[in-house]
Curated annotation (Swiss-Prot):
Binds to the B.thuringiensis toxin, CryIA(C). It is an enzyme of class 3 (hydrolase). It is a lipid-anchor; GPI-anchor. Binds 1 zinc ion per subunit. Residues 1-15 form the signal peptide. This is Membrane alanyl aminopeptidase. Midgut brush-border membrane. One of its GO terms (cellular component) is cytoplasm. The keyword Hydrolase applies. Zn(2+) binds at residues 357, 361, 380. Its EC number is 3.4.11.-.
């Protein structure tokens, strides 16, 4: 879970709860059997829970048998009803609990009748985590039953369920217990129906030690009593109707560090007592964002339940970025605490971004909840959408409308562009592995991008009207996608919003995007003599250009032209439902056209050679900003991806990208950094050509460097400072000498006591260590150890791997796995990534370290799989691959599943070498010729046939449809080879 290792790590990972699964892992998960046996039967349903917990930390009270340190006792009472007749077994969840007693009763008159079947033992049945309860008589419809159980569990350290953490304040080391229940870990705290569809109300009681602060939970404390054993018992107000995964409680010595002191709209920030005013920014933004969501949805937050308040808490060890527990939002410290002097702009916007995401969940996820995780996008897609566009209304300075494209949409497209990608709605999600895998970039970022596209299709007002209808209709309930589609269709009908698109409904349109994986490449061929523009859609695949699973989408079409440029009107001119479409441009002669204005749709665009030449000419002109910044960003990203797949040669791609020499805007450069980083990785084994490529990149940075400079200036805008942070990190990495000199000098000044502006520290730290000594690293590491600001510690941790000193690298690696708490468990992954990937020379050094420390790494991380995968996928020579393979073979019996991980990583490294061998000539031709203006004369403006470098074997078998399938049909016939060749041949040049 990384925060700032280059731009790619900025893009969309941090707001997920739990941590999203990388798309590469999805391919492995998708091969697993999705076992519906993991789902609870729906024969009974809960109405209300009363839960009492008593946690024990490092001291066990005398006189209580069987207790161990870091454990808890619990009692739960669950009121349930059968949903059908003749139910003899109740099934709910439990995991890692010892059931001490359990009985099922019902009230008859003034007494309770026990119907628990005799002769049964109550255990948490694995792997399903089921607690089965047989009854002596069948349950009767319309009768309420009561399950009462006592149990015992352990406060684990794995950051799941009810777990323990610690921190250091003025008094020393403090223990605490907190929770993370999503997606299925409430069952580790108490027996329950641990699926989102089983909503109920909850009364929570916590019996804490007297010297702890008052317990924090979803609701305010209703009653406090002192028990005979001296403990304090705190009972909270009843929750709204909610799912188990949204419950939370914190037993700690926390204090309120920021408070709005508004009894009508209470909002507080909780944290350890030595963080000062670091909660003020999250409080300020939280209040504004909560009010903005209330206005957006027309549903006031504080009226959702009686006594509802809003609290946010900073957790030292937290597996997720943040969690949307109703009334108690929990965060990693680095993602909620902010120091204006010492936290950089990345964290300023990150705090706002994540607070917005979690607050949006109060409506999308809490008030209305996805019925099951197969439609998680109903929760997370809306929250990701809101965290950008709602935050943009509250604080426009943060630039979220611009940043959504490179940070979310383009990242989602990358993840969505492999054949193993999953659909937003995936009915095969049942088992825990599949559920965890569905917390993915596709679910979050693609979900948000499709919602953004839908808003442009309907208009803002109609879209909001539909969302309000959806929320009102499903409040305190669960939802399926058709509930959303129906509400949006009703709003569209009321506003006549789809009248221009004959036969289009939101239901039919949205299903092509939610039930189908992938997205289209829209290939545009312009006949400049006649003005006819031919559009062809086909599913995009990033490695070959052609998916093995063709499909059709309902594509909202927007476009503009040079003679009358209009990038502001994002209402689609038509919705393309078939394989092809012809549009009359309305003019004749050469002029550029650009489709998908401001990237308002979720699709890529390729053009014929002449049109690409005209676009390139426009981008290199003084009037390039006539083309919207987001469209320029789209062009950069599309060109990189078209070239990667082989649909476009790198010679042509670099010809187009040569315009970056004149570009200085934020979004195009973030797209360029991402694209260049992918290519640089594949040049890493070839020092001479890598140097040439890096020199080309440095040459392209003239305009952006001239605007940004290497130092922060007084009065600079937020977006300028943020862009400088990203651009300088990138340019120092590719060897820009002025950047390196500035970084080294600032690092030296810092060692001598000078202050470095927070927005410069990531690249200054990294550059200073990369070109520094062991003494520099030791000074840096000692400063890291004593640093108390959590997000500054993360910045330093992720720069530490930039050292090229071998002894310093080993010191860093040993610190990660030493168990001495210098690196917290939640930061192990990002720290290892920094150590292995920040310098190519570190890869084999890290491998040598791994081979000598397998046992210690396994004790700390659970296995060597993660670091081994990172190492083996970055090998640069056949000699390195042979060395690693030899070690894998020799240790196959002891490293288990990590063996296959290593073999697959070597295959990735070998594929990188082969890719370079296959494509290097295209780069060399551009290095030789430089930019070429290849627009043909007006006399030959018909799009010329393009050469192709893709052989027919690239394509799937021909499947010729007997009849034309209906748009949106689940049985869309595969495109023929001829159609695909036409699509790809538009711009495949040697």
């Amino acid at each position: 879970f990384t925060i700032f290792l280059g731009v790619a790590l900025l893009q969309g990972v941090l707001t997920l709860s739990p941590i999203p699964v990388p798309e590469e892992e999805w391919a492995e998960f998708s091969r697993m059997l999705r076992d519906p046996s993991y789902r609870l039967p729906t024969t009974t349903r809960p109405r209300h829970y009363a839960v009492t917990l008593t946690p024990y930390f490092d001291v066990v009270p005398a006189g209580v048998s069987g207790l161990t340190t870091f454990s808890f006792d619990g009692e739960v009472t669950i009121y349930i009803s059968p949903t059908q007749a003749n139910v003899n077994e109740i099934v709910l969840h439990c995991n890692d609990l010892t059931i001490q007693s359990l009985r099922v009763t019902y009230v008859s008159g003034n007494s309770e009748v026990d119907i628990t079947a005799t002769g049964q033992t109550f255990t948490c049945e694995m792997p399903y985590s089921f607690l089965r309860i047989r009854t002596s008589t069948p349950l009767v419809m319309n009768q309420e039953y009561i399950i009462r159980s006592t149990f015992r569990g352990n406060l684990q350290t794995n950051m799941r369920g009810f777990y323990r953490s610690w921190y250091v304040d003025r008094t020393g080391k403090r223990w605490m217990a907190t929770t993370q229940f999503q997606p299925g870990h409430a069952r580790q705290a108490f027996p329950c129906y641990d699926e989102p569809g089983f909503k109920a109300t909850f009364d929570i009681t916590m019996n804490r030690e007297a010297d702890f602060s008052p317990t924090i939970s979803n609701m305010p404390i209703r009653a406090t009593t002192t028990l005979t054993n001296g403990r304090i018992s705190e009972t909270f107000f009843t929750t709204p109707l909610t799912s188990t995964y949204l419950l939370a409680f914190i037993v700690s010595h926390y204090q309120v560090i920021s408070n709005n002191n508004n009894a009508a709209r209470p909002f507080r920030i909780y944290a350890r007592n030595n963080v000062g005013s670091q909660g003020d920014w999250s409080l300020e933004m939280g209040e504004k964002l909560l009010l903005a969501m209330e206005n957006y949805t027309a549903i006031p937050y504080y009226t959702m339940a009686q006594n509802l308040d809003m609290k946010q808490a900073a957790i030292p060890d937290f597996s997720a970025g943040a969690m949307e527990n109703w009334g108690l939002l929990t965060y990693r410290e680095a993602l909620i605490l902010y120091d204006p002097l010492n936290s950089n702009h990345h964290y300023r916007q990150r705090v706002a971004n994540i607070v917005s995401h979690e607050i949006a969940h109060m409506w999308f996820g809490n008030l209305v909840t996805c019925a099951w995780w197969d439609n998680l996008w109903l929760n997370e897609g809306f929250a990701r959408f809101s965290q950008y566009y709602l935050t943009a209304t509250v604080d426009p300075e943060l630039g979220y409308e611009i940043r959504f494209i490179p940070e979310q949409l383009q990242v989602a497209m990358f993840s969505d562009s492999v054949d193993s990608a999953h659909a937003l709605t995936d009915t095969s999600v049942n088992d825990p592995v599949a559920v965890s895998a569905h917390f993915s970039t596709i679910t979050y970022a693609r979900g948000a991008a499709i919602l953004r596209m839908t808003q442009h299709l309907l208009s803002y007002d109609t879209f909001v009207k539909g969302l309000r209808q959806y929320l009102r209709a499903r409040q305190f309930d669960v939802a399926e996608p058709y509930h959303l589609f129906s509400a949006l269709d009703a709003a569209a009908a009321e506003d006549n919003a789809l009248a221009a698109y004959r036969g289009i409904t939101i239901d039919a349109y949205f299903r092509t995007w939610s039930e189908k994986a992938g997205h289209p490449l829209l290939s545009v061929t312009v006949d400049h003599e006649s003005g006819r523009m031919t559009l062809v859609q086909a599913r995009w695949e990033r490695n070959t250009g052609v998916s093995r699973f063709p499909g059709l989408w309902h594509i909202p079409i927007t476009w503009t032209r040079a003679g009358a440029p209009d990038f502001e009107n994002l209402k689609p001119s038509q919705v393309m439902t078939g394989q092809s479409l012809v549009i009359d441009r309305g003019t004749r002669g050469q002029e550029w056209v650009i489709f998908n204005k401001q990237v308002s749709g979720f699709y890529r665009v390729n053009y014929d050679n002449t049109t690409w030449g005209l676009i390139t000419r426009a981008l290199r002109s003084a009037n390039r900003t006539v083309i919207h910044e987001l469209s320029r960003s789209q062009i950069v990203d599309d060109v990189f991806q078209l070239a990667r797949s082989g649909v476009m040669s790198y010679q042509r791609a670099l010809n187009i990208l040569s315009y970056l020499r004149f570009e200085d805007a934020y979004a195009p450069w973030l797209s360029a950094i991402s694209g260049f980083n992918w290519v640089i990785r594949r040049f890493a084994h070839d020092a001479a050509n890598l140097q040439t490529l890096q020199n080309q990149i440095i040459g392209l940075s003239e305009a952006v460097v001239a605007r940004l400079g290497f130092t922060e200036v007084s009065g600079g805008t937020y977006m300028t400072d943020l862009q400088r942070l990203h651009v300088m990190q990138f340019l120092c990495n590719v060897g820009h000498q002025q950047c390196i000199d500035a970084g080294r000098q600032n690092f030296l000044n810092w060692r001598n006591g000078s202050f470095i502006p927070a927005n410069m520290r990531p690249w200054v730290y990294c550059t200073g260590l990369r070109y520094g000594s062991a003494e520099d690293f030791n000074y840096f590491w000692n400063r890291y150890i004593v640093e108390d600001l959590s997000n500054e510690k993360v910045v330093m941790l992720e720069a530490a791997g930039c050292t090229r000193d071998q002894a310093s690298l080993e010191k860093f690696l040993n610190a990660i796995v030493s168990g001495n708490d210098d690196v917290r468990p939640q930061d192990h992954s990002s720290a290892l990534s920094s150590a292995i990937t920040s310098n190519d020379v570190n890869t084999m050094r890290a491998f040598d370290w791994l081979t000598k420390n397998v046992d210690q790494i396994t004790r700390t991380l659970g296995s060597i799989t993660s670091p081994l995968n990172t190492i083996t996928s970055r090998l640069l020579t056949e000699a390195q691959m042979t060395q690693v393979q030899t070690w894998l073979d020799a240790n196959r019996n002891t490293i288990g599943a990590a063996y296959n991980t290593g073999v697959n990583g070597i295959a990735t490294s070998r594929a990188n070498l082969q890719w370079s061998a296959n494509r290097m000539s295209e780069f060399l031709r551009f290095f030789e010729t430089g930019f070429v203006d290849d627009v043909p004369s007006e006399a030959t403006t018909v799009a010329p046939p393009a050469e192709t470098t893709v052989t027919p074997s690239t394509f799937p078998p021909t499947v010729a449809p007997a009849t034309t399938p209906a748009p949106g049909s689940g049985n869309i016939a595969a495109l023929s080879v001829v159609s695909l060749l036409v699509t790809l041949a538009i711009n495949m040049v040697a």
